[in-house]
UniProtKB/Swiss-Prot annotation:
<dbReference type="InterPro" id="IPR016181">
    <property type="entry name" value="Acyl_CoA_acyltransferase"/>
</dbReference>
<feature type="modified residue" description="N6-succinyllysine; alternate">
    <location>
        <position position="41"/>
    </location>
</feature>
<keyword id="KW-0493">Microtubule</keyword>
<comment type="subunit">
    <text>Binds to microtubules.</text>
</comment>
<feature type="modified residue" description="N6-acetyllysine">
    <location>
        <position position="83"/>
    </location>
</feature>
<dbReference type="GO" id="GO:0016410">
    <property type="term" value="F:N-acyltransferase activity"/>
</dbReference>
<dbReference type="GO" id="GO:0005813">
    <property type="term" value="C:centrosome"/>
</dbReference>
<dbReference type="GO" id="GO:0005739">
    <property type="term" value="C:mitochondrion"/>
</dbReference>
<comment type="similarity">
    <text>Belongs to the glycine N-acyltransferase family.</text>
</comment>
<dbReference type="GO" id="GO:0043015">
    <property type="term" value="F:gamma-tubulin binding"/>
</dbReference>
<feature type="modified residue" description="N6-succinyllysine; alternate">
    <location>
        <position position="140"/>
    </location>
</feature>
<dbReference type="GO" id="GO:0005874">
    <property type="term" value="C:microtubule"/>
</dbReference>
<dbReference type="Pfam" id="PF08444">
    <property type="entry name" value="Gly_acyl_tr_C"/>
</dbReference>
<feature type="modified residue" description="N6-acetyllysine; alternate">
    <location>
        <position position="140"/>
    </location>
</feature>
<feature type="modified residue" description="N6-succinyllysine; alternate">
    <location>
        <position position="255"/>
    </location>
</feature>
<keyword id="KW-0808">Transferase</keyword>
<keyword id="KW-0007">Acetylation</keyword>
Amino acid sequence: MFYIQSSEALQILKNSLRKHLPESLKVYGTVFHMNQGNPFKLKAVVDKWPDFNTVVIRPQEQDMTDDLDHYNNTYLIYSKDPKHCQEFLGSSDVINWKQHLQIQSSQADLGKVIENLGATNLGKVKHKQCFLYMVSHTAKKLTPSLVDAKHLVVSSEKPTPFDHQLFKFARLDVKHAALVNSIWYFGGNEKSQKFIERCIFTFPSVCIMGPEGTPVSWALMDHTGELRMAGTLPKYRHQNLIYHVAFHQVHTLEKLGFPMYLHVDKVNLTIQRMSAVLGHVPMPCTWNQWNWVPL
């Protein structure tokens, strides 16, 4: 087991992960931001170096003091050989199976290993799988072979403009975290609000302010570089505001050179249509999250 800490080693790791896109996307996005100052103070662990098979990105041990906070206790995993990484992932030095935690990966094949480890460590595993998209600009740069007409869903829909007298673009403030948390699918609790506050404070965000001077539609970015937690207040839905937020967010982050990707729930047809309008590229792999609760 090796810890990857220096900027030089992180760059080598990022370059290696790029060769395995899109399956390595979740870890690639995280390592990109680790090498841009590592604002979430994460660490990379590999089974061997430099010719690694499996890499795990996780918080520092001293930052994992709350055994019940799976938003903080998050592990990002990529393995070149997902069927034979169980011993490495089972090590307590790699993953603390005594805590509530979540594992995210662009590899569904890790599911069997995680289920086995869940049984070994006596706990419950809940799996959520979603569609995975890469923003077209990012896909053209990182995975040009996937940017092909046969992979794209062509949409002729055009969103209606919004009233710029009533609605204004802005950046979210930490004080808006409770509002975001109130309608986030994975949120709605005190620990998720702390995570949202940290994302708003650390990374660029976009919102549309409504007539009352509060956000009515928004989108954030998390510590893995994923575009997440987008939402619109029920009162303002069906006005295509989320499209304008997403479009503005992509162009803002594109100027910063960030790789951009996102997941969409398999039943969320509205955001799937929006992704088609925006030209997001659907990936052949999926977004996966496993929530683990020890008994």
